[in-house]
């Protein structure tokens, strides 16, 4: 394990932008959050799983409640200061995979929002995963969730896993004013050489759409699609290219940045986040899991608790790849310690 820590500091909004807690009530926040998904799915319903601090939005269109978007909140913070965090999940994933990171931030006093990106967590996602405007739908949802989060307090940190991290960075580079810190877990700022090469082939999106056909959502993991749709992967590449263009034009990251990544990540090579860090002017924390741990891309945010709750069905595997069976990150507790230091 290698940990590079560059003057870790909390992600605080400048005093000039500190307007205190918005007057929006907890009920208004929940209704607005729910309205995003009523519009997207057509109908929502209360989740059966309830807890004192958790508010989820469920629907019959979802595979199960573990795929549902949720919020963690305690209510107004004494002294009129509220901290809000937004965590976006990865491509083919669901909010389930953000649970443990969300709990860490909640324990540190944050209200945490974990949205569900369009096209994810559903029983039937064929029309979504063949949508030419899927990336634009992701971006629009990211924007509306962050706008809601900005109403809720005077400190806002945003990030996510893989594609979720890329979407957070892309939004920051286009609308930086209300974001005070970024968090990337296996951030998808580069893809494998093969994937990036394929994305440059003329007409590849049409071909991918044809090959994808009827998209399979049911598989061994109840909270993750069994495969990434080809067209959706190319939509992600568009997001990555947009980030690179912004950086090439001279854009810089001006807020504290937390980055956690495995050197053995073959899905999103670590070079992508290293390039971003090279264009940052803030205090950063870079947590690197050494190659000797052989930690796969998706396993970075998995601890023993999440793995046990996953109920992964190995008997349904159709292929035996090195990273096909989820494992817990042996350095998760150390990563969590570094994240806590970052936000304090």
Which positions does each model-derived feature cover?
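Short, surface-exposed "cap/lid" segments of acyl-processing enzymes
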Residues: 65-120
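Catalytic active-site module of serine/aspartate enzymes centered on a nucleophile-bearing elbow/loop
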Residues: 296-344
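Catalytic nucleophile-loop/oxyanion-hole region of alpha/beta-hydrolase
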Residues: 123-152
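Gly/Ala-rich beta-loop-alpha elbow adjacent to hydrolase catalytic centers
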Residues: 159-168
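Acidic catalytic loop of the alpha/beta-hydrolase fold
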Residues: 263-268, 294
């Amino acid at each position: 394990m290698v940990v590079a820590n560059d003057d870790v500091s909390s992600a605080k909004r400048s005093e000039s932008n500190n307007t205190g807690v918005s007057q929006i009530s907890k009920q208004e926040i929940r209704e607005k959050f729910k309205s995003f998904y009523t519009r997207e799915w057509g109908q929502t319903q209360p989740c059966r799983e309830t807890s004192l601090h958790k508010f989820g939005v469920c629907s019959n269109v979802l595979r199960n409640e573990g795929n549902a978007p949720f919020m963690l909140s305690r209510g107004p913070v004494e002294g009129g200061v509220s901290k809000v965090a937004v965590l976006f999940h990865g491509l083919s994933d669901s909010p389930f995979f953000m649970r443990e990171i969300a709990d860490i931030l909640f324990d540190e006093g944050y209200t945490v929002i974990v949205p569900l990106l369009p096209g994810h967590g559903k029983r039937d996602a064929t029309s979504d995963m063949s949508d030419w405007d899927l990336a634009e739908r992701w971006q629009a949802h990211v924007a509306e969730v962050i706008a809601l989060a900005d109403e809720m307090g005077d400190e806002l940190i945003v990030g996510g896993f893989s594609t979720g991290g890329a979407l957070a960075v892309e939004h920051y580079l286009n609308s930086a004013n209300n974001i005070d810190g970024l968090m990337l877990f296996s951030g998808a700022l580069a893809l494998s050489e093969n994937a990036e090469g394929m994305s440059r082939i003329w007409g590849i999106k049409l071909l991918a759409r044809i090959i994808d056909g009827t998209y399979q959502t049911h598989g061994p993991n109840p909270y993750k699609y069994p495969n990434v749709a080809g067209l959706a992967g190319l939509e992600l590449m568009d997001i990555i290219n947009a980030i690179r263009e912004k950086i090439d034009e001279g854009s810089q990251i001006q807020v504290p940045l937390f980055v956690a990544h495995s050197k053995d990540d073959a899905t999103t090579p670590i070079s992508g986040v290293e390039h971003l860090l090279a264009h940052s002017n803030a205090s950063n924390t870079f947590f690197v899991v050494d190659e000797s741990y052989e930690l796969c891309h998706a396993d970075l945010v998995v601890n023993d608790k999440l793995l046990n709750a996953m109920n992964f069905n190995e008997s349904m595997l159709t292929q035996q790849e090195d990273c096909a069976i989820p494992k817990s990150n042996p350095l998760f507790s150390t990563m969590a310690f570094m994240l806590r230091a970052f936000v304090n």
